[in-house]
Amino acid sequence: MFEATTILGYRGEMGGKKFALIGGDGQVTLGNCVVKANATKIRSLYHNQVLSGFAGSTADAFSLFDMFERILESKKGDLFKSVVDFSKEWRKDKYLRRLEAMMIVLNLDHIFILSGMGDVLEAEDNKIAAIGSGGNYALSAARALDHFAHLEPRKLVEESLKIAGDLCIYTNTNIKILEL
């Protein structure tokens, strides 16, 4: 279900300034065939105050995006309240409970994973989250680079996704990054 991509979210503070970034590769795979190498799976929401990215079924992911964006607008960009309401609304709709997609949403203060089952997970360290087939590779690389290297945030996201792209056959190194 989550083959064909890697999405990495990273937030924190450097030099007294908060940052938030999301990056993703561009590969779309259908079975054992790459059908697109430069897809965009990340976007900014709510007047460029929230970043998001998806992994999984494209149609299901757009359903997730639409639903989350509507809730985010109604909560005037409050990410924490939006993810709570997202989960509540999700549990009420039997159709939504079967979506085969996941999302990462983040701003300067929070980072969450939203699942196609209606689960909302805050990143363990409230700093780094990854989803998709190469997510564990990207997460491991990002944690190591965050802990031991003093890289600029954009470089950390880029290098972590490159490592995932080198290891995961469903992830390429055609990387796109958005930042707040």
Swiss-Prot record:
An example Gene Ontology molecular-function term: metal ion binding
Is-annotated flag, keyword Metal-binding? yes
Query: Would the keyword Protease turn up in this protein's UniProt record?
Result: yes
- Give the matching InterPro entries: ATP-dep_Prtase_HsIV_su (IPR022281), Ntn_hydrolases_N (IPR029055), Proteasome_sua/b (IPR001353), Proteasome_suB-type (IPR023333)
GO CC list: HslUV protease complex; proteasome core complex
Active site residues of this protein: T5
Cellular compartments annotated: Cytoplasm
**Ligand binding (Na(+)):** G165, C168, T171
Report the catalytic activity.
ATP-dependent cleavage of peptide bonds with broad specificity
Give all cystine bridges in this chain: none
Enumerate the UniProt keywords alphabetically.
Allosteric enzyme, Cytoplasm, Hydrolase, Metal-binding, Protease, Sodium, Stress response, Threonine protease
Q: What class of enzyme is it?
A: hydrolase
| PROSITE patterns found in the cross-reference section | PROTEASOME_BETA_2 (PS51476)
Q: What is the superkingdom listed in this entry's lineage? A: Bacteria
> How does its record describe regulation of its activity?
Allosterically activated by HslU binding.
Tell me its EC number(s), please: 3.4.25.2
Q: Which GO terms describe its biological process?
A: proteolysis involved in protein catabolic process
Q: Which family does it belong to?
A: Belongs to the peptidase T1B family. HslV subfamily.
Assembly with partners or alone: A double ring-shaped homohexamer of HslV is capped on each side by a ring-shaped HslU homohexamer. The assembly of the HslU/HslV complex is dependent on binding of ATP.
Its job: Protease subunit of a proteasome-like degradation complex believed to be a general protein degrading machinery.
Report what the protein is called.
ATP-dependent protease subunit HslV
Q: Which organism is it from?
A: Helicobacter pylori (strain G27)
